[in-house]
A protein has these predicted regions:
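A short acidic, often aromatic-flanked loop/helix-cap motif at beta-alpha or helix-coil junctions
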Residues: 1-2, 90-95
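Core alpha/beta nucleotide-donor-binding catalytic domains of modification enzymes
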Residues: 1-51, 58-70, 77
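Short, surface-exposed amphipathic charged segments that create phosphate/polyanion-binding patches used
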Residues: 7-8, 98-103
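A secondary-structure boundary/capping signal
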Residues: 16, 56-57, 89, 107
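Short catalytic/ligand-binding loop motif for oxyanion handling, primarily in non-cytosolic enzymes
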Residues: 18-22, 60-63, 94-97, 111-114, ...
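Conserved S-adenosyl-L-methionine
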Residues: 58, 80-92
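Residues at alpha-helix caps and immediate loop-helix transition turns in enzyme cores, especially N-
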Residues: 64-68, 100, 251
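S-adenosyl-L-methionine-dependent DNA methyltransferase catalytic core
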Residues: 75-79, 101-255
Length: 255
């Protein structure tokens, strides 16, 4: 009930991305999860916060030939908000994953904030190597299989050149499907996912100190720029899913 929600100046929300994600079934507003946006609109209509920040996946820009985006913009504008949206990439904000997400930044019209432009981020580049734990417990993350194939040429650092700003695939597990691809720690990581199968589900696999392994939950926290004192869920499956669903902290703080 919207009346039970305390008054607030800023509403932050993310209607579930699975309804619009390329990796999902892309049912959009036909998915009950996608209709959560209209619950957000209902809360906005009741409380009239000064500012709104909403987040969703890149695919929402073109979902249903642009009709989904048009509905979102028209709904927010109809509630008397000036609406701006930006496609932001995680690797531009000091984390080693591209993770492109759309952010809707809205100002109540009576505040008279017009022509809003988000300034350019100024973060140092990070590779996966920069977020690794020093002595992690490998019991739950190391992948030991006899169908691992590594391309030795691709792990030679002299060959990397300017490819550090994207994931560098250096091998596969089994047939190399989703969750079965191996990457170098000297590039960015793949986008963390809340779902997916394969030996390296949710994080991807990396060659680290001669071993093939997934990222630890703490490394996933760092991939999302969570602080070191953030308490991680003890249930590791839940923790991986939470980080796959999370928003990059640095981006929200920057906005």
């Amino acid at each position: 009930k919207e009346e039970k929600i305390p008054k607030h100046d800023l509403l932050c929300g993310g209607f579930p991305c699975q309804a619009f994600s390329v990796s999902g079934k892309q049912k959009g507003f036909e998915d009950t999860r996608g209709t959560l946006f209209f619950d957000i609109a209902r809360i906005v209509n009741f409380h009239r916060p000064k500012f709104i920040i909403l987040e969703n996946v890149k695919n929402i820009l073109k979902h249903d030939s642009g009709k989904t985006l048009e509905t979102i913009l028209n709904t927010l504008k109809g509630l008397n908000y000036n609406v701006y949206f930006e496609l932001l990439r995680g690797s531009d904000f000091g984390v080693p994953q591209n993770r492109e997400r759309v952010f809707f930044i809205c100002f109540r019209k009576d505040l008279n904030i017009k022509n809003f432009i988000l300034s350019k981020p100024n973060f140092n580049f990070k590779s996966v190597k920069d977020i690794l734990e020093d002595n992690p417990n490998l019991d739950d993350v190391e992948i030991k299989r006899n169908d691992i194939i590594i391309n030795d040429k691709k792990i030679n650092l002299d060959l990397l050149g300017n490819y550090q700003s994207k994931p560098i695939r250096i091998g596969i597990i089994s047939k190399g499907g989703q969750g079965e691809r191996i990457y170098s720690i000297y590039g960015t990581g793949i986008t963390l996912s809340a779902f997916g199968g394969g030996s390296a589900a949710k994080t991807g696999a990396y060659l680290i100190d001669g071993k093939i392994r997934k990222l630890t939950t703490r490394e996933c926290a760092r991939m999302m720029s969570f602080p070191e004192n953030f308490k991680i869920c003890q249930n590791k499956n839940q923790a991986y899913q939470q980080f796959g669903n999370a928003v990059i902290v640095n981006i929200v703080k920057f906005i």
